Every structure is written in C-alpha cells, then in structure tokens.
Swiss-Prot record:
Cross-referenced Gene3D superfamilies: Anticodon-binding domain (3.40.50.800), Bira Bifunctional Protein, Domain 2 (3.30.930.10)
Name the UniProt record assigns to this protein: Glycine--tRNA ligase
EC number per UniProt: 6.1.1.14
CDD domains, alphabetized: GlyRS-like_core, GlyRS_anticodon
Primary localization: cytoplasm
InterPro entries referenced in this protein's UniProt entry, alphabetically: aa-tRNA-synt_IIb, aa-tRNA-synth_II, aa-tRNA-synth_II/BPL/LPL, Anticodon-bd, Anticodon-bd_dom_sf, Gly-tRNA_synthase/POLG2, Gly_tRNA_ligase_bac, GlyRS-like_core
Cellular component GO terms held in the UniProt record: cytoplasm
Record-listed substrate binding positions: R100, E163, F210, E211, Q212, M213, E214, E322, P323, A324, A325, G326
C-alpha cells in the first residue's frame, strides 16, 4: 500500500476506533486540533512510559521535572524567543491564504532537487496551481500570548511556552543542588507546548498545541561533540527497538545557515511520511545548544548557573545536548509503521481481509482481550472473573458481541497482542485458548498458569 494511502487509512482508523477525534467536532471543530480518545490516551501513555524508562529511570545520570506552562515573561525575552521565534509569512494573491515562505521553498527544493532560481516567483500556488504571486515575507511570531490578572495590558502579558526546555534551564541549579547531580547529567520533561503555527496540518503532525518529550543533557565543554553523537545514535535506535522499520528512518543534518540561534549542530531523525509535498518529515531533533541557554539566563537573571569542577578546580558553564521529540509525531509514526493488511480464515471456510496493527507489545493500548465463546452465564461468569483478575496487571478488554472471528478482527486492528477465549472446554479442563495477534497461532494454557504465561510475553509492559 502506498504510504500516502496509509496516512489516510490510519487517520480513518484513528477516528473510527477512538484513538483520535477532531477537537470540538459538534461545533465544527478547530483546524488541526485533536482530542485523544480512550485508545489514543493509552497509546500516548505507553509511548511516554517507554520514553521515560529509557531516558530517565533506566539511567543513573538523568532525573525528571515537570515545569510550568506559563513561565515569567523575562524567560522568553532572555532566551531570544521574543525576538527571533518568528517565521516568514507570505500570502497568495490568488487565494489570500497564508503560508510559511521557508516551507514553500523547502518543498520546492525537495521536489526538484534544487532551490527555485527566482525564489517564491517560481513556486505555484499550492491550492490552485497558478503561477506564484506572493506578498513580501513578513515576520510572524510563533509565540502564543496570554494575560494574567484582571486587565489585558503589558504588565499581565505572558506567553504559553513554545518548548519545555526553558523550564529545565531555569531549574538547572535547583535540580543540580537538590539531586546532588554533576555534569554529565540530564534533566527530562514531558509536557504540553504551544506554537502559533501558520500552516498546521497533516493530521497530528503539526498542531498548535502539542506534547513534547525533551531532555537537556549538561556536559563539560569539549565533550559536547562526543555526547551529541551518543544521543543521536541512542535516539535513532529507540525507534527501531520499538518496531519502526529502519528503512523508513533517516538522519538529516541541518545546514549551517539554517541552524537555530542557539545551535552549534542539529541532526533530525526523519520518517518517510510521504506527505503530499514532502517525503520526509521531522520526528525528533537532537541539538548541540552549546552554553547558550545557561549563559544568557545567568546574564539575564543575575544568578550564577556555572558549575565548579572540584577535581580540576575549574569553573565552566555546561554545554547542552538536547534530544527533543514530539509525542504526536511519534504516535503517528508507530501507527503508520505498524499498519498491515493480510488475510485470515473466516467461519465459512474462506478468507477475509485482516487489518492488524503490529505494534510493539509495550505500546499496544490493550494488552489482552478476554472473549467468552458464548454469552451463556456458565461462560460469561468465569470470563468476567478472569478479566477482572488480569486487569490488576494490564489494560484488558472484555468483548461478548459477535462471532469469535469478528471479535478477533476488532482486536487485531487496535493492536491487542493476545486474545484469551473462554469456551465450553474450559469448564472441563480449566484451560483457555490464547491467540497471538501477528501469527494468529493458538495454544491452550491452564488457567492457573495464564497470568505467568502472559507476564512472560508482556515483559516491559
């Protein structure tokens, strides 16, 4: 199946099965804003859990924080965001729709293999295909404003954070002292960020409200390049370990002229989304932010954010390596890469098309489905009891509606690794049938061994 059609199919599946809904749909919705349904919440939490385990709890040199969405306004002035967190905005004179000029230029270069000789004049209107007629680019702030207090005035002006990183930097000294950490060490944060995107879109890929998984790793100057490469490799491998096909991933080195104001070097992990105007899209960025952030916040706040190395007697401002991932983008990648269609036998002796999400078991929203073969009390009673017992350990779904094959299909398309069928033989042999999602193989497991069997199969879940 072509990748673009996979996007459309996955979007349809997400809406139909309750992973993602359009925000405020009964009122017409908000463009590129999404609510996460019951299964979507579970998938998101599982992704966050795996990220946190890998980046924080499995390491002795990283700790976590949860910082405020609304920071003092001076944080964003000092960091440079108020001045430079802008995008070039242009308007089509054909449709009067607005676009980011850099996105138009990048899409042209990716399609043609070279930048447009005459700049925007060579770029056709994306909607109508007419020869390009554009306004002059204007700076457009990506910061979302809000006001604190009873009056909407300059004194109450604040910003919703466009990244979680600054909350980490301003807490650097607090964390270092209270946790008795010293470089090299990291501080991680998962939370909501907000950006006033000009052209949000592509499902949950680019939205104005999004969730980030970021870690700032503080190192001694001179050791930054080695640590940067370490985190590039580690983050790339994380996606592969959770089931993403490495052929669908690539590393993209930012050209020097396109680096952010704080960056010495940035490498993106990109995924082959195959959007209409671009094959590759950023999944995660790993940046060498140098000592920029701690240095400017030391100057702006008057607080010394340097580190005194007792072993060498030197004082220095740490460099920062930042792996920054978007949770929505990660979720989109895991869904697209897990989506498969194959065939499965039906009750009539033929075969049906089967949609299956071959999600890594650690990510699957539901781990086990308990399915009584019949609604009769002699089966439904023990099945309900079994489901209640298994819920103490995993997210379990209980389903009695429809033929057993149809119920298997429902679980396959949401990625449930195991279906446990309670049948009439269970009443005689105290065993159940366990079906594995990907192979569709079925084995008989005694009830008193079921929990242990599933625990072995669901390690890390």
């Amino acid at each position: 199946m072509a990748q673009q059609s996979i996007i459309d199919t996955v979007v349809n599946l997400c809406k139909r099965r309750g992973l993602v809904y359009p925000c405020g749909e009964i009122y017409g919705g908000t463009r590129s804003a999404w609510d996460y349904g019951p299964l979507g919440v579970e998938l998101k939490e599982n992704i966050k859990r795996q990220w946190w385990r890998t980046m924080v709890t499995s390491r002795p040199d990283v700790v976590g924080v949860d910082t405020s969405v609304i920071l003092p306004r001076q944080v964003w002035v000092t960091s440079g965001h108020v001045e430079v967190f802008t995008d070039p905005l242009v308007e089509s004179l054909h449709t009067h729709k607005r676009y980011r000029a850099d996105h138009l230029l990048e899409a042209y270069e990716e399609k043609h293999g070279h930048p447009p000789a005459n700049g925007l004049a060579d770029i056709n209107d994306p909607e109508t295909g007419q020869p390009g007629k554009w306004t002059e680019p204007k700076a457009f702030s990506g910061l979302l404003k809000t006001f604190l207090g009873p009056v909407d005035d300059e004194e109450g002006l604040h910003y919703l954070r466009p990244e979680t990183a600054q909350g980490i930097f301003v807490n650097f000294k607090n964390v270092m002292n209270s946790s008795r950490m010293k470089p090299p060490f990291g501080i991680a944060n998962i939370g909501k960020s907000f950006r006033n995107e000009i052209t949000p879109g592509n499902f949950i890929f680019r939205t104005r409200e999004f969730e980030q998984m970021e870690m700032e790793f503080f190192v001694k100057p001179g050791e930054d390049e080695e640590w940067h490469q370490h985190w590039i490799d580690a983050r790339h491998q994380w996606y592969i370990d959770l089931g993403v096909n490495p052929d669908n991933l690539r590393l993209y080195e930012h050209p020097q002229e396109k680096l952010s104001h704080y960056s010495k070097r940035t490498v993106d992990i990109e995924y082959a989304f195959n959007f209409a105007n671009s094959k590759w899209g950023e999944l995660e960025g790993i940046a060498n932010r140098t000592d920029y952030d701690l240095r400017v916040h030391s100057e702006g706040s008057g607080e010394d954010l340097s580190y005194f190395d007792q072993e060498t007697g030197e004082r220095w401002i740490p460099y920062v390596i930042e792996p920054a991932a978007g949770l929505g983008r990660a979720m989109m990648v895991f869904l697209m890469d897990a989506y498969h269609e194959d065939e499965a036998p039906n009750s009539k002796g033929g075969v049906d098309k089967r949609v299956v999400l071959k999600l890594d078991r650690r990510l699957a929203p539901v781990k086990v489905a308990v399915l009584p073969l019949s609604k009769k009390p002699e089966l439904s009673g023990p099945a309900e009891k079994l489901a209640a017992e298994l819920r103490q350990f995993w997210n379990v779904e209980y389903d009695t509606s429809g033929a057993i094959g149809r119920r298997y299909r429902r679980q396959d398309e949401i990625g449930t690794p195991f279906c446990v069928t309670v049948d009439f033989d269970t009443l005689e042999d105290n065993a159940v049938t366990v079906r594995e999602r990907d192979t569709m193989e079925q084995i008989r497991v005694p009830l008193d061994e079921l929990q242990g069997y599933l625990a072995q199969q669901l390690i890390g879940c």
